[in-house]
Amino acid sequence: MARRCEICGKGPLVGNTVSHANNKNKTRSLPNLRSVRANLAGEIRHIRVCTRCLKAGKVVKAGRGRPTASAQA
């Protein structure tokens, strides 16, 4: 499973940690991904979305189960 947002395509970043002795070690910064049940074109799927896309409202979350009587009124 790829560590990539399915909406914006954000993925891991690669950089260096540099010690005081100027030694360089590779490090990866992973995106903050969440698994979400989303409604995509009328189809409910599990997708991996970054929290930035969730906050921006780019994803319509799918509800769980049938609506209750109070929600229909």
From Swiss-Prot:
Gene Ontology biological process terms, A to Z: translation
Family per record: Belongs to the bacterial ribosomal protein bL28 family.
Protein name as catalogued: Large ribosomal subunit protein bL28
Entry's Gene Ontology molecular function annotations: structural constituent of ribosome
GO cellular component terms, semicolon-separated: ribonucleoprotein complex; ribosome
Sorted UniProt keywords: Ribonucleoprotein, Ribosomal protein
UniProt xrefs under SUPFAM superfamilies: L28p-like
Top-level taxon of origin: Bacteria
Entries under InterPro entries matching the protein: Bacterial_rp_bL28, Ribosomal_bL28, Ribosomal_bL28/bL31-like_sf, Ribosomal_bL28_bact-type, Ribosomal_bL28_sf
Pfam families: Ribosomal_L28 (PF00830)
